[in-house]
């Protein structure tokens, strides 16, 4: 699969807002402090963006790390209807927008569409409790808009505390119309950690957004860190939302049965996007010991309307291909279950060896062999889609 290459003009836009990195060791130290905060090694502080050092660290490192993550679920959403946004105004709202990371990822992705598939204009709303974050979001998107006059952008920034103030905020945000996309990127993990009854509050936040913000034909994109705890929390939230019947899952799941990753305590389901890390990210990784050689995250695409039913032979790849002695194995998900599919190396087919986490694959000709499945003679393996790379 081709690597994702971070756009050079976006690096220039981000660099103009972040300012000169200065001493890279000091920048790396601030990135390390943010990492400890985000993974729970230090107590949560929602106001980290108020620190100039932490703001620069986030813009220089975490913004380019997180921006591409929204583009994979967007591609999954568009796969069913490539002209979904064509020639009309697209409205999107980002809940807990930070410095506009996901919105910048959205508009970057939109400009890469074929001209016939692009929206005529984009109306964005960014909600965050940090004044500093919203200032950065406005500056970044203003610079981006200046480079893409063919796709007019308009941004409205709203400062509020989502959990406490959304009953007043959501009707105001939707005053000009409901949204085609509601984005919640790296938000629910903060709600779970920061507030009492955090899991229930996170669930209610998305349910409320579906009721008050989302257009009937729209989608909610949820992106969470690819850690076991945060991914499994998202699996539990998925099951809760689907059980209540207001939302349906369009990706990555091919079914609406309870998530099979929760059948054990050790499993979780994430995406893994291969990329070429920008030089500043690679250098900070070297200085801190962080590893962003690929981008791991959990995501859901949810919508009020049900998706198309997957064929019985369609599976989602939920692991890397495991190279064992004499055979290769891979985990697949569909129909409410995970299975292990094995292929002997002496029977190896290129398509099997080339499978990657996140692929949709059509498999004709599997047979159960004890606890696992094997490809039968004459079986056919066909990759339907690959995780998008730019």
Question: Over which residues does each language-model region extend?
Answer:
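N-terminal auxiliary segments of SAM/dcSAM-dependent transferases
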Residues: 1-45
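Class I SAM-dependent methyltransferase Rossmann-like catalytic core
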Residues: 44-82
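Conserved SAM-binding loop of SAM-dependent methyltransferases across substrates and taxa
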Residues: 99-117
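S-adenosyl-L-methionine
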Residues: 135-173
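A short SAM/SAH-binding and catalytic strip from SAM-dependent methyltransferases
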Residues: 179-199
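A short glycine-rich, Lys/Arg-flanked "PGG" loop and its adjoining helix->strand segment in the class I
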Residues: 200-217
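Conserved beta-strand signature within the Rossmann-like core of class I S-adenosyl-L-methionine
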Residues: 216-224
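C-terminal lobe and adjacent flexible extensions of AdoMet/dcAdoMet transferase-like proteins
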Residues: 279-390
